[in-house]
Amino acid sequence: LFIGIGRACIVVPKFQYNLFVGLLDIRMSIELTRKLFAHSEKEWSVLNETIRKTVFELFAKGDFPGLIFTYMCAFDMQSEFDYLQNVIDLFKSNDSNCYVVELCADFEERLVRNKSENRLLHKESKRNLEWSEAEMRKTSEKYRLNSYDGESLPFENYIKIDNTTLAPDEVAKMIQTHFAIEGRKE
C-alpha cells in the first residue's frame, strides 16, 4: 500500500504506471458520492467511507500488486493519523508492505496544477475553478496540510518530497529509489 498524503499528488499516475498497481485517488469516491448525495448529508459520508473501506479490504486480502491511495491529510488532527493507521494496519495484517509518501508544493504551484487539463478531466467537481480555488484557500487556512520540517510522524516507511519544481518522473524515481522498489522494465 502506498499512501500519498499532502497536496501535490501529480506524481501518482507515473508512479502507478511504473509499478502496475491500482489507484484510489481520494477524489474517486468523492466524485461518485457527490452525484448521489449533498456533501452535508450524512449519507454522503457513509457511502464515501464504505467505498474506500471496500476497496481497501479487497486489495488487502486479494492477490494484487498493490494500491496507491491519495489522501489530503490534516496534520493538526490526530483523527487523521488514526484513520491512516487503521488503513495501514489492515494491509499489514494481510502481510503487505506499506509506504507513506508526503508530497508538498508551494501554494501558487498548487493553484496552477489545480487548473491543469488532466486534473480537470478526471475531477469533475474541480471544473468550477472559482469554487475550487476558493475551497483550496479555505482548506489551507483551516488545516495544516503538510508536516513541519523535521516533524516526527508515526509511519514506519515514510518520505516527504517537495515537488514544487520536480517533474512527475523525477518524483516517481525518488520514491522508488528511497524505498528500493523495482519498477516496470521498459
Where are these regions (language model features)?
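Short, amphipathic alpha-helical "lid/cap" segments that border enzyme active or binding sites
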Residues: 52, 56, 168-176
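Glycine-rich phosphate-binding loop used to anchor ATP phosphates in small-molecule kinases
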Residues: 47-101
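Conserved nucleotide-binding/hydrolysis micro-motifs of P-loop NTPases
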Residues: 15-17, 29-30, 74-76, 104-109
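Conserved phosphate-donor/acceptor-positioning beta-strand/loop module used by diverse small-molecule
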Residues: 92-115, 161
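C-terminal alpha-helix
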Residues: 174-185
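Small-molecule kinase domains that catalyze NTP-dependent phosphoryl transfer to phosphate-bearing small molecules
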Residues: 116-171
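Conserved beta-strand scaffold positions in the cores of enzyme catalytic domains, especially
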Residues: 9-10, 23, 98-102, 158-160
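Conserved substrate/cofactor phosphate-moiety recognition/catalytic segment
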Residues: 3-60
